Structures are given as structure tokens and as C-alpha cells.
From Swiss-Prot:
Domain FH1 intervals: 457-544
InterPro entries: ARM-like, ARM-type_fold, FH2_Formin, FH2_Formin_sf, FH3_dom, Formin_Homology, GBD/FH3_dom, GTPase-bd
Low complexity compositional bias, start-end: 1161-1171
Gene from which this protein is expressed: forD
Protein name: Formin-D
GO CC field: actin cytoskeleton
Keyword Secreted recorded: no
Quaternary structure annotation from Swiss-Prot or TrEMBL: Interacts (via GBD/FH3 domain) with activated Rho-GTPases.
Domain FH2: 562-1037
Domain notes: The DAD domain regulates activation via by an autoinhibitory interaction with the GBD/FH3 domain. This autoinhibition is released upon competitive binding of an activated GTPase. The release of DAD allows the FH2 domain to then nucleate and elongate nonbranched actin filaments.
SUPFAM superfamilies: ARM repeat, Formin homology 2 domain (FH2 domain)
């Protein structure tokens, strides 16, 4: 019986046709070539046929069957549909649907979308919404969906190439960095970070986009907006921002380029921000990872720069360093500048101990150091040129150790004193020259105006020269000889009377007629001449009837112009600056007809005199001068003493006098006495004040002038016996504890350091290093060593691995100790004093103790040694310098020459090398013998002995006893430390005479620093690996959960198929089709098979990415590496690319990026996977769920053969 409604039996397919069909399916879903070959070779024909049927049935059920709504769904899911929508301001629903399709559809769909210029349209939509001045929630949502779609496109290689084809696309993406929405901002930064490392063109494109952002947003500084992300309270944004900063720095292959970008962020203050974020690192491990990575990369780049600059040159070899710089600059623009710098430095060298040369070199070193670190050095330049190298004129010699520092300091102080004296003399000469110039100018003006005698009279009244009481007036006789005048004093009243008599005397008529025929100028000149002659004679005016000198013989006098003014002014008038016409100039002008005497009688002369009379200041000056204060000593010194006196509030001069005499420490505390020591009055100042007082006593009471406050104070305390010695003794006493307790702990620290160096763990590490070194140097001249010089431990960091980046012999030593002898890793925790003492100076501390001992000996000698009374020594022999430090070299007036001091220093050095532990004591004995030898010369200028009840003797006796005990203990400690140093140097094979204690300890400190940093590097590397492993395990766990849920769904469907109704349906189908039994089995594996195929696409391994042509998911993998800080892996991947050399950035329609890398900023955090789930918290996931639910409903529809759910599907789509 023929089955009318039965299906004909299908023809069996050949294996070749099955392979072709299976290969086409693999091509359609985008399986990579390597996996495609693997599947084709390993999978049997039956399994291939099952996969083909499973894929075909799903495709057939989705795309072929259904009503009109299903056909409509096919259209709305096509790339053409989305491209058309993007051209016409798409809605947020369309953009969401496009994002879902880009994530779910096969690569063939994506390629078709890209071929229709979908990227450009997406960028256009992004720009249109970004440029809006006011953005609403929908605009922000659209921007987020566009960015998410672009990220999905860039997740494949051909999609990435389509995006970076136009550099303006990256420009447009970077402009969204200022969006207020946090997740969108984070996504932009993540895209930029991944782009830096995913392609060789990525870093130039991103830097170009930063430049474009800076220009468009009009930012003043590069990267400023990106940098602000570190200050955002969001931890995710902070970590992502820091990740982008590290990516921008570390992605470049050139260390110079990396340092340039890093310096840009240093100028923005990233170092300070890293310190401010310290509390956040504990709660934000991603941020802590990025911080550690930044510091590590910075340290590595600095080391690499040094190595590149010097090659194998040592830092301690200046000749090799100069040669290396010359080799690098030869033939370039820097050569001439470098040569000029060397020439200037050579010309500036005068003497290594001169403070100016040393100051200049220290200044140059400081400025260049700040330039290399990207720090500002303008303040240092201003301070150096404005303040002589420092705010207080001091010189930084802290790094100079030992007696050399003492000699330098002494010479500096001597030069300062000499400079001060020279400046004072020059200032006095300048003042004197100025006074003389003013007097000459005034006298010339007075002579021209005919008032020479009046000017001299005023000078006599105003000024009284100091030697006026001793000088004798002289008169000049007609013969030119000078004879003394009478010694009777001339009072001011007599001079005024004579002056008025001289100026008001009238000439006889004959003289008047004679003068009336002279010209006005001649008349004035003759008057001046007569007055000058009178003033230069004996001072007695001419009698009233005496005629003036006759005119020159043979001369004809010109007619004079008649006097046009009726009377002269009674007072001196201001001048009217007109240009006068003479009679001969007004002949043909209207002035010829003017009545010159018309207003002589009616002119208000008194009113004019009151309004325009010249101001008279003589009386006011006399009032100011009378009883005014006078500064006798140097003005600046007097001002400083006045400032010092202002410290004594509510303390009178008598109280200060008593405090100095009795050494009262309650009034003269440490800070006050340190200032007081600088202004001890000198003998010249005291003599000048005494002379001034004697001069003023000879003047009348009303004409005496007062001393200034500073001079009164000096005059008061100058009567204290042994004033200078008392102030110096109190200064020494108050400063003794501070100096002793500053030097003694440093010496004790050296003592402890040398004891700690005898640690057995140190020797164990040295043994291990020796074994490693002999193995590495086997067969070379350096091999087969029985030991090594101790500073060789710092050269371990120069031996680097050729496999692991930045991995040195120090890293290997740490890993070896961790695996074999972990207890040795804490060796440096057992020697803390070694690290601390390496930054101190043993010679400087011991020299300080020597100075204190010498000061005690001198003080004891002055107080207790009874000597005959003699002339008081001059203040120039002071034993304490202006900085408050004892100058033991001035204890005698017969100071040693430099040659003697040098020979003495050589003898002391020879004694130190010969002695064994007693060098300090021997030098101290020598110093004592010097003091005793010079005592005979001191006796000539010594003072009378102190009385037993003198406070100076009473108070200092107890101090001397206590201080001697303290100094003895310290000197014993110094001797013990010297012995320890020599023994430890001998133990390590070093010569103690050729190395300083602090230099020896610095070797271990430097190795300790490298050991700690290398250990930190390994910890960071381990942390990166742990995080990567954790992410991988988490990813595998999620995949297993997905597979488990899929299997459960399959089992549930199988159970459903195995139900009675389903069994009947299967039997009916079996009767109608013999092949349906196979299809039912195939259908059970539909989901499993599709999941298996897509697994090869969605989870490619990093190793496959380099060989893949269409790899998918690579952006996520790169972001994970960036978050973990695994830039070593990123650089390794870049080296495996075909073109590892980075090309220059191509900036379309933009100016070429300058070398200085002045780029703007952006921000960063990690949310790639989070954003996939919740892009904007705007029900985006709900839209995606609706799409998935729609697909599941279609699947159930096909399995059950039920067409009644079409309406439900339409509602789901809507």
C-alpha cells in the first residue's frame, strides 16, 4: 500500500560532501584556521553529520518557518537594516539591538556590517550625541551603546583594523572622556589602554587622540583631564586611570620616550598624588598593583638610561663618563654646548677649598639633578643669584667629611669676616664721597648766588666736626702765609651780626653811580666777586664807605639796562621759569611800546611774597637736629643689635648687664646667646663711642646729640670685666650638650654597625655569592676565585638574564635563598645600624669631639691659670666665630701659617697610620702640647686673674668637671670604634687607610637597597601571576556552570521527549519517515554541539592570537593583562609581532605631534566584563534578555510543532 503522505527516503551523502558542508559551517561561524584543521582531522563523519544537521535545523527553524512576523524579524536583524537606521538618527532601542546582535551573531554577520561602512556611521552617531552642549539621559545612553558596539567590533582583528584605519575615529572616541557618566568614562579609558598594546599603531594613535582632546577642550597642560581621574573618589576610576597612565608609559619601546611621557605626569604632580592615595591601597588592590608597577617601571627605566649612557662604565670613573658623553654628542648639535660647559667649568676652578667654587659646583649638580627628575629648578636659580647660594649665605658642605670640612668651614668664616670688613669700608667711602659731592655742589650754587658766606655760616651752625675743639682757626695773609687767629670763640650771634652788617651796608654815591652804568650780569658778577673775596679773607666785612675794586684797565663798559622793578622782594622767592628778552631783542615787537613801570606802585608785593615765597626749612632742620639720636657704629650692625635688644622684652639694660656678668641662663638662653655672640662690641666701636661722648661734653647742652639705642647698650656693657670671655664662655657652655649629644650617638651608631657586621648570616650569603660567581665565570680570568672584593656585591645587578626581562643576579639570589635558606632573607633586618651609619660621617663627629676638648682646655686655662696683668687683647683674636663655633686655631696671637698647619696635618695622619687604636688619644695629646707651647706667647696679652667669688669662675668650675667626664667617655668610644673598624676591614680584605668608615658601610647599604627592591619586584611578579591564575580559574568555573546548566536543560528536554505524548509523536513520525529516528537523536545534541563549536571562537588562547586572522575576545584578554600589570607579557607579545618597530603616528588633518609629547589627559578603571552585564544601569540587560527569550520561544515552537505562539513572539519582539 502506497503512503500518500509519506516522505521519500533521503539519499545517503558521501563523506566528501559531508566534509565540504561541515567546512562551510565552520567558515560561516568564524572558526580560526588552526582549529578548523583540527576539527576536520579529528572528528568522524557521523559526528560531522550530526553537527551539520543540528546547525541546519536551527538555522532552518529560525529563518525559514514562521508567519509574517518571523519574516519581518529576519529583516530587522540584518546588517543592512542597522546601517539604514544609523543613517537617520537611530533610537536607543535600535542601538541596543545592534549591540546585542554584534555580540551574538557570527563573524560573517559582522564582516557584512563592516563592509557597509558601519564603523563610520557608529562614529558619526557618537559625535552627534557627544557635541551636544546639554545632554539628557537618552543622549548618555546612546553614547554608551555606541562605545559598547565599537568595543565589540574592536574585539576582533579585522574589526580593530577597520576602526584604526581612520585616526579620527580614535579622536572621536577619546572626546567622550569628559562624560559625567562613570561607567562610560571607564570604558573609553579601557579602550584607549587596550589600543596602546593591541597594535603597533595603537600608542601613536592614542597619543595623537590626547593631543586632539587637548586642543578641542582647550586644556593648558597635557594629560590634565586624565590625571584628574586619580583624584576622583571612585576606586574603579582611580585604578583604571592609573592603568592607562602605566600603559602610555610602558607601551613605548624607547626608554627616552617612556621618560618623556613619565616626566609629563611628574610635572602634573603624580608623585604627590601617589603619596596622598596611600590610605586607598589597602582597600583597592588594583590601584596598589598599578602604583607598584609605576614605581618599578620608573626605577627600571632610570637604570636603563644610565646603562645606555655609560655602557659598561662605572659611575666612579669621571674620565670614562666624559668620554662616553663626547662619543654620544660627537657630530651632533649638543657637542658644542657640552664643550662650552666643560670650558666654563675648567675656568671656574680656583681651589677645591674655596667656598665659591664649591658652591658653584654644588649648585650645578643640584639643578641638573632636578632637570633629570622633571622637577622645577627656578627657585634654586633665584636663590643662588639673589642670595649668594642660600637664604643665609651659607654653604652646604654636609657631604664633606672629616678635618677637611673643618678647614673649609674655617676658611669660609675668615673670608666672610674679610668680606664684611671690606664692605663696611666701601660703604663708608661711598658715604663720604656722596657728602663731599653734595657740599661741593651746594657751595658752588651759593657762590653763584652771592651767598657763599651765608652757606658757610649755616654749615658752622649745623655741623660741629669731632676735632673742632682741638683745631685752631687760621687766617691767610696777603702774602699767602697762614697764621693762627685768636682762640676766642666766635658765637653764632656774632656771626649773624657780622653777616647782616655785611649784607645791609650801603655803598657811597660815587660807587652807586659807577655801578649804574654797568650791565646787570657784570653787576652781579662783581658782587659775587666781592663777596667771595670777603669770605676768603679774614672774615671781617668791608667798611661801609670802601669802594669796590676798580674795573680792568683799558676796558670799555657797555651801557646797562635800567632796573625795571621798583623794589626787590624782602624774602627769597620761587622762580618763574620764563625765557627773558633783552632790550636788543624787543626792538620791532609790541614789547617796545609796553609801559614797564606802570604797575610799580600798585603791585601787591606783600601778597605775592606770601603766595610765592620760597619755603624756609632752616628752623625746622635745627629743631630736628637738636637732641636727635646719632648712629656712631656701622648702620647695619647697629640695626642688628637693635633687633637683638628687641628680644629682651621688659628687660632693662642694667638687667642685661647683670645677666652677662653673672652668666644668668634664665635671661641669656641658648637662642639668645647664639645671636649675642655675633655682636660682641669690638675695641674700635667702644673707642668711637667714647670719643663721641667726650666731644659732645664740650658742646653746649642745647647743641648736644644723643647716642642711638645700640650705642647706649654697647656703652653700658663695655664696662663689664672680661666681657668677651664671659659671652664666649656662656656660649660654649650652652652649646656643649647639644654638640656632644649630637656627635656621640653617631659614633655609637658606627660602633654598633661594626659589631653587627660580624653576623654569620652575612658570611653565609657571601659564600653563596662566591659559588654562583665561580660557576658563571668558569673558564675565564675571573673564575676560580678564592674570594672577592666586598664592593663586588653591588655589581650583581649588572648581570642580567637574557630570558626574563629586568631579571638580575640579585633576583636569582633571592629566589635561591627562598627555596634553600629562607632564614637568610632577613639578614639585613639584623644589621639596622649598618644602614643608618652609612649616611653619617665618622670623621666629622670625631672632629667635633676634638673641638670640644680644645675648647675645654682653653676655657680652663683662662679661668684657673693665674697670669700677670697685661694689655687686653684685641677683639680680632676672638676664639669663637660668627656662627657660634669654637675656633681653636686662634688661641694665640702668633697664628700658624697654612704650611705649618698642612705639615701638622700630615704628621697627624702618619701618627694615625702607625698607631693601633690610640690615634685619637695621640692627636689629643699633641693638641694639649700645642696649647701649652703657646701659653708663653699668650702671657704677653693675658688678663688679670679672676677673683674666687667671680661668677665666671664659680659657675664654670662645676661645668668643667662634668663635661670632662662626658668627653672622656666619648673619646674612649671613638678609640674602640677605630679599633673595630680596622679589624672588620681586615676581616673583609679591605685596607682601612684607603677607605672611610661611612664609605665602607655604604657598600652594604647599597646592596641592601638593591636586595629590597629586587625582592619587591619578585613579589609584584608573583602577585601578577596569582591574579592571572585567579582570573583563569574564575573563568573556568563560570564556563563549567554554563555547561552544567546547558546539560540540565538538555536532560529536561530529553525527559520531555520521553513522556507518553512525546513517545506517540515520535512513533508517528517514525512511521511517516524512516530517518526521523536519527533526527531525534541529532536534536538532543543541538545545543551541546553548537556550544562546542562556539567554544573554539569565544575562548582563544593568547598564543593562538598571534597566528589568528580573525581572533575574537582579544581586547578582554589584553585588559586583564593591563589590570594585572603584566606588561612583561604584553611586551613579549609585541616582540612576537611581525613589525615590532613602532611606526610614527599618522594624524589625519592634524598637525604633527611634537617630540615633547605635550598631550592632554583622560581617565581609567576596569569594567569591561561589568559593563557587558550592566552598561548604564538603564534596563539594557532587560532588552538583551528579551532577545534571548524570543530565541528560546522559537526553539520550543519548533520542537513542539506548535504554531499558536506566533502572537506571543510578536509581543516579545515589541
Amino acid at each position: 500500500m502506497v503512503k500518500l503522505f509519506g516522505k521519500s527516503k533521503k539519499k545517503e551523502e558521501s563523506p566528501q560532501s559531508i566534509d565540504i558542508a561541515f567546512q562551510s559551517i565552520l567558515d560561516e561561524i568564524g572558526v580560526v584556521e588552526t582549529e578548523k584543521k583540527h576539527l576536520m582531522a579529528t572528528m568522524d563523519t557521523v559526528r560531522k553529520q550530526q553537527l551539520i544537521q543540528s546547525y541546519s535545523s536551527k538555522k532552518f527553524s529560525k529563518n525559514e518557518f514562521g508567519n509574517k512576523s518571523k519574516k519581518k524579524s529576519i529583516i530587522t536583524q540584518s546588517p543592512h537594516y542597522f546601517v539604514d537606521c544609523l543613517k537617520n538618527d537611530p533610537s536607543k532601542e535600535v542601538l541596543t539591538s545592534l549591540r546585542v546582535r554584534l555580540g551574538n551573531q557570527p563573524l560573517k554577520w559582522l564582516k557584512e556590517f563592516l563592509s557597509l561602512d558601519g564603523v563610520s556611521l557608529l562614529i558619526k552617531v557618537l559625535i552627534l550625541n557627544e557635541i551636544k552642549q546639554v545632554k539628557n539621559q537618552e543622549d548618555i545612553y546612546k553614547i554608551a551603546q555606541c562605545l559598547h558596539s565599537l568595543k565589540l567590533i574592536m574585539n576582533t582583528k579585522f574589526g580593530l583594523e577597520s576602526v584604526i584605519k581612520q585616526p579620527t575615529n580614535i579622536h572621536s572616541i577619546s572626546l567622550v572622556m569628559d562624560t559625567p557618566h562613570l561607567k562610560t568614562r571607564i570604558m573609553v579609558i579601557e579602550l584607549l589602554a587596550a589600543l596602546c598594546v593591541v597594535n603597533s599603531k595603537g600608542l601613536p594613535l592614542v597619543l595623537s587622540a590626547m593631543d586632539n582632546y587637548r586642543e578641542v577642550k582647550r586644556e593648558k597642560k597635557p594629560f590634565i583631564h586624565l590625571f584628574q581621574g586619580l583624584k576622583n573618589p571612585s576606586g574603579s576610576l582611580q585604578a583604571t586611570t592609573f592603568a592607562l597612565i602605566n600603559t602610555l608609559i610602558s607601551s613605548s619601546q624607547s626608554v627616552e620616550e617612556r621618560q618623556k611621557i613619565r616626566n609629563q605626569f611628574k610635572k602634573l604632580g603624580i608623585t604627590k598624588v601617589i603619596e596622598e592615595l596611600e590610605p586607598e591601597y589597602a582597600n583597592n588592590p588594583d590601584l596598589a598593583t598599578q602604583k607598584d608597577l609605576y614605581e618599578q617601571e620608573c626605577r627600571w627605566d632610570e637604570q636603563e638610561q644610565i646603562e645606555n649612557a655609560r655602557g659598561d662604565i662605572s659611575d666612579e670613573n669621571p674620565e670614562a663618563l666624559v668620554k662616553a658623553i663626547l662619543d654620544r654628542t660627537a657630530g651632533g648639535p649638543l657637542y658644542s654646548s657640552f664643550t662650552s660647559i666643560l670650558r666654563l667649568l675648567a675656568n671656574s676652578i680656583t681651589d677645591q677649598t674655596k667656598d665659591q667654587s664649591l658652591s658653584n659646583y654644588l649648585f650645578v649638580e643640584k639643578v641638573i639633578g632636578k632637570m633629570n627628575n622633571g622637577e622645577s629648578y627656578l627657585d634654586d636659580i633665584g636663590t643662588f643669584f639673589g642670595g649668594g647660594g642660600g637664604g643665609d649665605g651659607s654653604l652646604d658642605i654636609a657631604h664633606v667629611s672629616g678635618e677637611k670640612a673643618v678647614l673649609i668651614q674655617k676658611e669660609i668664616e675668615d673670608l666672610k669676616k674679610q668680606k664684611k670688613r671690606d664692605q663696611d669700608k666701601l660703604a663708608e667711602k661711598d658715604k663720604l664721597l656722596t657728602k663731599l659731592a653734595k657740599r661741593m655742589r651746594k657751595m658752588e650754587e651759593a657762590i653763584k648766588l652771592g651767598k657763599g658766606l651765608e652757606y658757610l655760616n649755616n654749615q658752622i651752625e649745623i655741623e660741629s666736626p669731632p676735632d673742632s675743639s682741638t683745631s685752631t682757626p687760621q687766617e691767610t695773609t696777603p702774602g699767602g702765609t697762614k697764621v693762627p687767629l685768636k682762640t676766642s670763640p666766635v658765637t653764632k650771634a656774632d656771626l649773624k651780626h657780622k653777616l647782616s652788617t655785611f649784607t645791609t651796608a650801603k655803598a657811597p654815591n660815587g660807587v652807586s653811580d659807577f655801578l649804574s652804568g654797568l650791565d646787570t650780569t657784570n653787576q652781579q658778577g662783581s658782587t659775587d666777586a666781592s663777596q667771595t673775596e670777603a669770605g676768603s679773607g679774614d672774615g671781617i666785612p668791608l667798611p661801609p664807605g670802601a669802594p669796590p675794586p676798580p674795573p680792568p684797565p683799558g676796558g670799555k663798559l657797555a651801557p646797562s639796562t635800567p632796573q625795571l622793578c621798583s623794589r626787590p622782594p624782602s624774602i627769597k622767592m620761587k622762580s618763574y621759569q620764563w625765557t627773558r628778552y633783552r632790550t636788543r631783542n624787543v626792538t620791532n615787537t609790541f614789547w617796545k611800546n609796553v609801559n614797564l613801570t606802570k604797575y610799580n606802585d600798585c603791585l601787591p608785593h606783600e601778597q605775592i611774597e606770601g603766595l610765592f615765597g620760597a619755603a624756609i626749612f632752616e628752623k625746622k632742620e635745627k629743631e630736628l637736629k637738636k637732641g636727635s639720636e646719632v648712629t656712631v657704629i656701622d648702620t647695619k650692625r647697629a640695626q642688628n643689635i637693635g633687633i637683638l635688644l628687641s628680644r629682651f622684652k621688659n628687660v632693662t639694660h642694667d638687667a642685661i648687664y647683670d645677666a652677662i656678668y653673672s652668666l644668668d641662663e634664665s635671661i641669656l638662653d641658648l637662642e639668645t646667646i647664639n645671636q649675642f655672640i655675633k655682636y660682641i662690641p669690638s675695641k674700635e666701636e667702644i673707642d668711637c663711642i667714647i670719643a663721641f661722648k667726650q666731644q659732645q661734653e664740650q658742646l653746649p647742652e642745647e647743641e648736644r646729640m644723643k647716642l642711638g639705642k645700640s650705642e647706649i647698650f654697647i656703652d653700658k656693657i663695655s664696662t663689664i670685666p672680661r666681657l668677651e670671655q664671659r659671652i664666649q664662655a656662656l656660649h660654649f657652655k650652652l652649646n656643649f650638650p647639644d654638640k656632644l649629644y649630637h656627635a656621640k650617638p653617631d659614633i655609637r651608631k658606627f660602633n654598633e654597625a661594626f659589631v653587627q657586621l660580624q653576623n654569620n648570616n652575612i658570611f653565609a650569603i657571601m659564600e653563596l655569592i662566591l659559588s654562583i660567581g665561580n660557576f658563571i665565570n668558569f673558564g675565564t680570568n675571573r673564575g676560580n676565585a678564592s674570594g672577592f672584593k666586598i664592593d663586588s656585591i653591588n655589581k650583581m645587578a649588572d648581570t642580567k638574564s637574557n630570558i626574563r626581562e629586568k631579571y638580575t643576579l640579585v633576583h636569582y639570589l633571592i629566589e635561591l635563598l627562598e627555596s634553600t635558606q629562607p632564614e637568610l632573607l632577613k639578614v639585613f633586618d639584623e644589621i639596622p645600624s649598618v644602614v643608618d651609619a652609612a649616611t653619617l660621617s665618622f670623621n666629622q663627629s670625631s672632629s667635633e669631639i676634638k673641638l670640644l676638648r680644645a675648647g675645654l682646655i682653653k676655657l680652663e686655662k683662662e679661668i684657673f691659670v693665674r697670669q700677670p696683668k697685661s694689655v687686653e687683647p684685641k677683639p680680632d683674636d676672638e676664639t669663637i666665630n660668627n656662627n657660634g663655633e669654637d675656633d681653636i686655631n686662634n688661641t694665640s696671637s702668633d697664628e700658624k701659617t697654612e704650611g705649618q698647619q698642612q705639615r701638622q696635618g700630615e704628621e697627624e695622619e702618619n701618627d694615625e697610620s702607625e698607631s693601633t687604636g690610640n690615634s685619637f688619644a695621640d692627636s689629643l695629646k699633641k693638641k694639649k702640647s700645642q696649647v701649652n707651647t703657646n701659653s708663653t706667647s699668650d702671657s704677653k696679652q693675658s688678663l688679670e686673674p679672676l677673683k674666687d667669688d667671680d661668677p665666671l669662675k664659680l659657675k664654670l668650675s662645676e661645668f668643667l668637671l662634668a663635661s670632662k667626664t662626658e668627653l672622656d667617655d666619648t673619646e674612649t668610644l671613638i678609640a674602640e670604634t677605630e679599633v673595630l673598624f680596622k679589624s672588620i676591614c681586615k676581616f673583609f680584605g679591605e685596607d682601612s687607610t684607603k677607605i672611610q668608615p661611612e664609605e665602607f658601610l655604604a657598600i652594604f647599604k647599597k646592596f641592601n637597597d638593591k636586595f629590597i627592591m629586587s625582592k619587591k619586584d619578585l613579589e609584584i611578579e608573583k602577585s601578577i601571576k596569582d591574579k592571572s591564575t585567579q582570573r583563569k580559574n574564575e573563568k573556568e568555573r563560570k564556563e563549567m556552570e554554563i555547561k552544567k546548566s546547558k546539560l540540565e536543560m538538555i536532560h529536561s528536554k530529553l525527559k520531555k521527549i520521553g513522556s507518553p505524548s512525546s513517545s506517540n509523536r515520535i512513533l508517528a513520525s517514525n512511521e511517516s519517515s524512516p530517518t526521523s529516528s536519527t533526527s531525534s537523536v541529532v536534536h538532543q545534541h543541538d545545543d551541546e554541539d553548537e556550544e562546542t563549536i562556539k567554544e573554539y571562537i569565544n575562548n582563544p588562547s593568547p598564543s593562538q592570537q598571534s597566528n589568528s586572522s580573525e581572533e575574537e575576545g582579544m581586547m578582554d584578554d589584553l585588559l586583564n593583562l593591563i589590570r594585572d600589570g603584566n606588561f612583561r607579557e604584553l611586551r613579549r607579545m609585541n616582540l612576537q609581532q611581525k613589525k615590532p618597530v613602532r611606526t610614527k603616528r599618522v594624524i589625519a588633518k592634524q598637525p604633527t605631534r611634537p617630540q615633547a609629547l605635550d598631550t592632554p589627559s583622560s581617565t581609567y578603571s576596569s569594567i569591561s566584563s561589568i559593563y557587558d552585564a550592566e552598561p548604564l544601569d538603564m534596563s539594557d540587560q532587560e532588552d538583551e534578555d528579551e532577545e534571548e527569550e524570543e530565541d528560546e520561544e522559537e526553539e520550543e515552537e519548533e520542537e513542539e510543532g506548535d504554531d499558536d505562539n506566533d502572537n506571543d513572539e510578536e509581543e516579545g519582539e515589541n
